[in-house]
Regions:
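Bacterial N-terminal signal peptides that target proteins for export
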Residues: 1-13, 19
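Sec/Tat signal peptide C-region and signal peptidase I cleavage site
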Residues: 19-27
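N-terminal "mature-domain start" segment
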Residues: 27-57
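Soluble non-cytosolic domains of exported or imported proteins
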Residues: 37, 84-91, 159-166
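Short, well-ordered turn and helix-capping elements at secondary-structure junctions
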Residues: 37, 46, 112, 127-130, ...
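Short, surface-exposed charged micro-motifs
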Residues: 39, 139-140
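Surface-exposed amphipathic alpha-helical segments
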Residues: 44-46, 146-177
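Conserved polar/disulfide-associated segments of primarily extracytoplasmic proteins
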Residues: 52-138, 144, 149
Length: 177
């Protein structure tokens, strides 16, 4: 039953994304996709998908059919207390990624601030090896009222178009209630 529910939800989401892709194009070759939590601009013709993991996260993702790079918009469920700051979010993200890529040479090659949703967020560029390939990931972290959001783009090093990530981050906005 759970599998059927997940499949139906996936089909519904793809329909929503496909419908969203028919909206007017923002910049040349891009479309703004809006959801219940956030909106961002994505490249046209990238393959959509989503993950909805019960009480953990909601993610929409788009895969470049040419390079295999993946662009993700993520909402992590569960509001954090007011004492939880952006620095805590960044520290937790790095620790989680270190664990995820353990034994693969995962490292933060660059970190700093980035403008996201009209406010300051944190930026991470990380690298690791996977199956003999050099991989990279660009991550923008955003914390608003205890809610955690990420824009992530990852793929094989040298095949990830950072301009796509930059446009998604620049256009990222919380959904209007």
């Amino acid at each position: 039953m759970r599998t059927v529910k997940s499949m139906l939800m996936a089909v519904g989401f793809v329909g929503v994304v496909a419908g969203a892709l028919s909206l007017p194009v923002d910049a040349a070759g891009t479309t703004k996709v809006s959801g219940t939590r956030f909106e961002m601009t994505i490249p046209d013709c990238w393959t959509p998908g989503y993950k909805d993991i019960d009480e953990k996260l909601f993610m929409i993702f788009f895969k470049d059919p040419k390079s295999g790079a993946v662009l993700e918009g993520v909402y992590l469920r569960g509001a954090q207390p007011s004492t939880f700051k952006l620095a805590d979010f960044k520290k937790a993200r790095i620790a989680g990624e270190d664990k995820r890529y353990e034994g693969k040479g995962h490292k933060v090659s660059k970190d700093g601030t980035i403008a996201i949703a009209g406010e300051n967020g944190d930026y991470l560029h990380t690298t690791w090896k996977d199956g003999g390939k050099d991989m990279e990931k660009h991550t923008a972290l955003y914390l608003k009222d205890g809610n955690r959001y990420l824009v992530v783009m990852s793929g094989e090093k040298g095949k990830v178009d950072k301009k796509v990530f930059d446009e998604a981050v620049k256009s990222f906005a919380l959904a209007k209630p």
